[in-house]
Amino acid sequence: MQKLENLSKNQKIILDLIEKSSGPLKAYSILFNVKKQGIKAPLQVYRALDKLIEIGKIHKIESRNAFVACKNSNCQVSKATAFSICESCEDVTEVSNLKLSKYLSNFADKSGMKYNKYNLEFFGLCKNCKK
């Protein structure tokens, strides 16, 4: 993973915002929140987001078209990610499960297809919402 000091100013600003967020953030919400810090155009946000994904600092939640900070220092960022998403409160938890990773690896091998990456999203109710 790339060190924080190697990030651009825009990447640092956006990473800081995403890390402090209590939930996934959409690109235009990010733009709205960083305008005062000199990031004025959507393209600036998308470039920073792309780089932060590439280096493993954040993940994209495909179903929400939103972004979250990577909480798992051992994750295979660009290859395999899985998330548990609460349908009630929208809480997102990164799933780190060795058995799941092995199963999906075997699945890819048996299917004969070469997967570049996968992003799994599990939906349900978190422990707080199912009470």
Predicted segments, located by residue:
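Short alpha-helical segments that sit at the start of domains
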Residues: 1-16
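Short amphipathic alpha-helical elements of helix-turn-helix/winged-helix folds
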Residues: 13-21, 33, 55
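Short acidic, hydrophobic short linear motifs in intrinsically disordered regions
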Residues: 24-34
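Short, basic interhelical loop/turn and adjoining N-cap
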Residues: 36-40
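Key DNA-contact positions within bacterial/archaeal DNA-binding proteins
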Residues: 43
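A short, conserved structural fragment
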Residues: 53-61
